C-alpha cells in the first residue's frame, strides 16, 4: 500500500515538472529572460520543492493564460491583450492595434520590444516585435507585423480577427534611448526594421528640449512597399529630421511622387552610400541599425569602413 502511494506521489511530481521548450519557442532575439531561462528557473524550483516534498514552493508559477491585460507587463509572464483593429497596410504587412485597460500605458521605453506567443498545429512559437505607437499612447499599442508565406507565426497572425486575444510578454531590449545623449542619430532600417526607430524618432520630436538631429534611411523593394508614409512625411517637417529611402527594385524617379524624388536612392544601401550619409552628418553620429541579420552585418561593416567605431552604433 505504501509503495502504491509512493508511486502515485512520484507520478504527481512528474506531472508538475516543467516541460523543456522547443527551439521554435525561442524568438532568437537574445531576450532576458529567454524561454529557456524561465524553464531552468522553474526546473530548479521544481527540484527544490520535490527534494523537500513541499509543493507550496511551486506557488510562484502561474500559467501564462491566467494573466489578463489588467496585470502589469512582465518579461516572465504572458499577458492577454485584445485586438481592436487590424489594418492591412501592404500586401503582406498588418498594422494591429491592441487594447489596454482604461487609459493605461504599455510602459515601454523607446527602443524596447515585446515577445508574441503563438500556437500553430499544437506547436508553440515566439517572435519579437517592437510596438510603433508612441510610448505615451494611452489605452492602446500598435504593432507592425510582416507575414511570410511559409512562416508559422505568419499563419497565426493571419488567423486573427478583431476581438481576438493575443499573448505578449516584455519589455526587452538593451538599447534605451536617453534624450539629448547623442548630438546626432543616423537610423538605417530595412523593411519592418523601421519599427524600433519610430518610437525613438517620435520621442525626440515630441520633446521640445531634445534637439538631436536625426537622419532616417528606410530600405524597401518598391515605393508601394514603404510603411507609414504619412508618419514619415510629418516627421520630416521638423527642423532636425531628414528622411531618405533606398528602393532596390525601382529604377526611375519619374515613377515616384515629386516629394520623394530628391530623397530616394535606387539600388541597395552599400558602402559608398553609407559613407556619404556619415559624411553628411553635422557631427559624428551614433547609428541605429535594424533589419535582417544579413542587413545588420553588412551595415556594421560599412559603418566601420566609414570611420565609425564599434561603440558608435547599435544593432537591434
Swiss-Prot record:
Gene Ontology MF annotations? cytochrome-b5 reductase activity, acting on NAD(P)H
Organism lineage reads as:
Eukaryota, Metazoa, Chordata, Craniata, Vertebrata
PANTHER family (UniProt xref): NADH-CYTOCHROME B5 REDUCTASE, NADH-CYTOCHROME B5 REDUCTASE-LIKE
Q: Which Pfam families does the UniProt entry name for this protein?
A: FAD_binding_6, NAD_binding_1, Oxidored-like
Tell me the keywords, alphabetical order.
FAD, Flavoprotein, NAD, Oxidoreductase
Protein's name in the database: NADH-cytochrome b5 reductase-like
Provide the catalytic activity annotation.
Answer: 2 Fe(III)-[cytochrome b5] + NADH = 2 Fe(II)-[cytochrome b5] + NAD(+) + H(+)
Q: Which cofactor does it need?
A: FAD
Stated role: NADH-cytochrome b5 reductases are involved in desaturation and elongation of fatty acids, cholesterol biosynthesis, drug metabolism, and, in erythrocyte, methemoglobin reduction.
Q: Which residues form the FAD-binding FR-type domain?
A: 76-178
Give the SUPFAM superfamilies listed for this entry.
Answer: Ferredoxin reductase-like, C-terminal NADP-linked domain, Riboflavin synthase domain-like
Which Gene3D superfamilies does the annotation name?
Nucleotide-binding domain of ferredoxin-NADP reductase (FNR) module (3.40.50.80), Translation factors (2.40.30.10)
* Entry keyword Oxidoreductase: yes
EC number, UniProt record: 1.6.2.2
Q: Which residues bind FAD?
A: 158-173, 183-215
Q: What class of enzyme is it?
A: oxidoreductase
Sequence ranges assigned to domain Oxidoreductase-like in this UniProt record: 17-53
Q: Which GO terms describe its cellular component?
A: endoplasmic reticulum membrane; nucleoplasm
Per the record, the domain of life is Eukaryota
| InterPro entries per record | CBR-like, Cbr1-like_FAD-bd_dom, FAD-bd_FR_type, Flavoprot_Pyr_Nucl_cyt_Rdtase, FNR_nucleotide-bd, Oxidoreductase-like_N, OxRdtase_FAD/NAD-bd, Riboflavin_synthase-like_b-brl
Species of the source? Mus musculus
Q: Which family does it belong to?
A: Belongs to the flavoprotein pyridine nucleotide cytochrome reductase family.
